[in-house]
């Protein structure tokens, strides 16, 4: 029967902490309280993989003795013998301890240990009468005393904010959380290996920028004391990576952090991880094919399959991704519009006003038809793009770094990839005309002067780099956190960031 007693109160917790501090004080009196001379030679998962299939007779014949260490998660004292569950970085293994083997003093010491303590065990591997793989302790040591009691098994870490704020406790108590971050590591590793296999060169570019650029976003501002100058945490590495293309590195990528001084939501964290890559002699169509394959490889690396379940719906990444223009997406996913209406700036502006958008303020006050259509897409269709879908043909006015189409006025060779209604990637054929780029920067400065806080600055050094000549290039950025949300069936970006940003504790 499950014990559903009330969760421990703060008073109970304070009493338990005091008792544990008293135990630690006694340990200090008797010798080294936190020894650091034990090295395990086995992990729980490896032991299960090797020996779960053997019976006790085979284990006895093998006579395998191991040294394991980890956190004690369960403890059952039954007179002269006890069982404990040890949790290490790979999983859990049962420990069997008996007074006759350990001796009176060591067994008495074990009985004083608490759930959460870090312990070391050495002994042979065997199976209990019930067939559970275990380690029979010939010796047992306390390596690190836990002063704070863990949440009890039934109540666990129920408070979602507590899970984010005290991720260390969440990782101890919640197997699913550990699996999420293991999958994240595998996904990033799979992406990195795929990039290296494709001939890309991994680089690291500055995190502190004298001029923020590479994205439409509000930066964090800081001050460099030694140089006595204002600096910005980077909002994107794009302009530095393209400088490297100018310098002769034809394929570069970077997996690193970006910082944007904006809101927090299930899809946004001020500090987040992006993978940006740039390839000389590539265009946006090549980028779409490459990105599609890259995301499949990440899914397989993290989960073993390109067919996933996300929030109880199937998500099939194995099939070709859809391609739609902004207007095609509105007509398909937002009911009631016609192409003639979408081609009428006054109509689109009126629709946006009905939907609650501030069309009188920046940036929409100065927006042309393309930017208005994009805003309507974001309000009406974006959230409905469950299937992987490339939205293509973005207007020039919202794409200041993208190459303009040779055949369609006002349109760039740009795409954004949406999956489950979220933007996952943004890429384009890069603008490598320095005079065109300078003109677009000037337009961005005008927008900033008119009140658009996310408009870009004029980066004279980047223009100088382009003036040396940049080959035709394609570049793309993939949001690692949002991608991992998909791969791990996580509803919030905070679920896939180890230490997400939270309000300061009172």
Swiss-Prot record:
GO molecular function list: ATP binding; lysine-tRNA ligase activity; magnesium ion binding; tRNA binding
UniProt EC number: 6.1.1.6
Principal location listed in the UniProt entry: cytoplasm
Cofactor(s) needed for function: Mg(2+)
Cofactor note: Binds 3 Mg(2+) ions per subunit.
Binding site for Mg(2+) 1: 416, 423
PROSITE patterns found in the cross-reference section: AA_TRNA_LIGASE_II
Gene Ontology annotations for the cellular component aspect, listed alphabetically: cytosol
Amino acids binding Mg(2+) 2: 423
Catalytic activity annotation: tRNA(Lys) + L-lysine + ATP = L-lysyl-tRNA(Lys) + AMP + diphosphate
GO biological process, one term: lysyl-tRNA aminoacylation
Classification via HAMAP family: Lys_tRNA_synth_class2
Protein family membership: Belongs to the class-II aminoacyl-tRNA synthetase family.
Subunit composition and interactions: Homodimer.
Protein name: Lysine--tRNA ligase
Phylogenetic classification of the source organism: Bacteria, Pseudomonadati, Pseudomonadota, Betaproteobacteria, Burkholderiales
């Amino acid at each position: 029967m499950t014990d559903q007693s009330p969760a421990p109160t703060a008073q109970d917790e304070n009493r338990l902490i005091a008792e544990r501090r008293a135990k630690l004080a006694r340990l200090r009196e008797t010798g080294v309280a936190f020894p650091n001379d034990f090295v395990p030679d086995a992990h729980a998962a490896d032991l299960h993989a090797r020996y779960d299939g053997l019976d006790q007779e085979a284990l006895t014949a093998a006579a395998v003795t191991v040294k394991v260490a980890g956190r004690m998660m369960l403890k059952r004292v039954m007179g002269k013998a006890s069982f404990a569950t040890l949790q290490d970085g790979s999983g859990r293994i049962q420990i069997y301890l008996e007074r006759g083997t350990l001796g009176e003093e060591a067994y008495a010491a074990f009985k004083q240990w608490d759930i959460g303590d870090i312990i070391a065990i050495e002994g042979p591997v065997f199976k209990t009468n019930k067939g559970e793989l275990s380690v029979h302790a010939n010796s047992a040591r306390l390596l690190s005393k836990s002063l704070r009691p863990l949440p009890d098994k039934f109540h666990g870490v129920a408070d979602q904010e507590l899970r984010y704020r005290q991720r260390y406790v969440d990782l101890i108590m919640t197997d699913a959380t550990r699996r999420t971050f293991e999958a994240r590591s595998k996904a990033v590793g799979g992406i990195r290996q795929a990039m290296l296999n494709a001939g890309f060169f991994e680089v690291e570019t500055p995190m502190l920028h004298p001029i923020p650029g590479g994205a439409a976003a509000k930066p964090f501002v800081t001050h460099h004391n030694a140089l006595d100058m204002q600096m910005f945490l980077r909002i994107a590495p794009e302009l530095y990576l393209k400088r490297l293309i100018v310098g002769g590195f034809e394929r570069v990528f970077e997996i690193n952090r970006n910082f944007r001084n904006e809101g927090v939501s299930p899809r946004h964290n001020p500090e987040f991880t992006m993978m940006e890559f740039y390839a000389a002699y590539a265009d946006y169509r090549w980028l779409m094919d490459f990105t599609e394959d890259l995301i499949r490889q990440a899914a397989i690396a993290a989960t073993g399959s390109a067919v996933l379940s996300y929030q109880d719906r199937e998500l099939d990444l194995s099939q070709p991704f859809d391609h739609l223009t902004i207007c095609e997406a509105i007509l398909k996913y937002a009911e009631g519009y016609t192409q003639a209406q979408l081609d009428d700036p006054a109509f689109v502006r009126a629709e946006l006003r009905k939907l609650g958008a501030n069309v009188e303020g920046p940036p929409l006050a100065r927006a042309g038809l393309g930017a208005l259509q994009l805003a309507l897409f974001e309000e009406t269709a974006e959230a409905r793009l469950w299937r992987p879908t490339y939205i293509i043909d973005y207007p020039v006015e919202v794409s200041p770094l993208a190459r303009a189409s040779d055949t369609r006025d006002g349109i760039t060779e740009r795409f954004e990839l949406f999956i489950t209604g979220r933007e996952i990637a943004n890429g384009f054929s890069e603008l490598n005309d320095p005079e065109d780029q300078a003109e677009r920067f000037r337009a961005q400065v005008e927008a900033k002067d008119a009140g658009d806080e996310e408009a870009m600055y004029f980066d004279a050094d980047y223009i100088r780099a382009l003036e040396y000549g940049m080959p035709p290039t394609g570049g793309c950025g993939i949001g690692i956190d949002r991608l991992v949300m998909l791969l791990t069936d996580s509803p919030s970006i905070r679920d896939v960031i180890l230490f997400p940003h939270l309000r300061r504790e009172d």
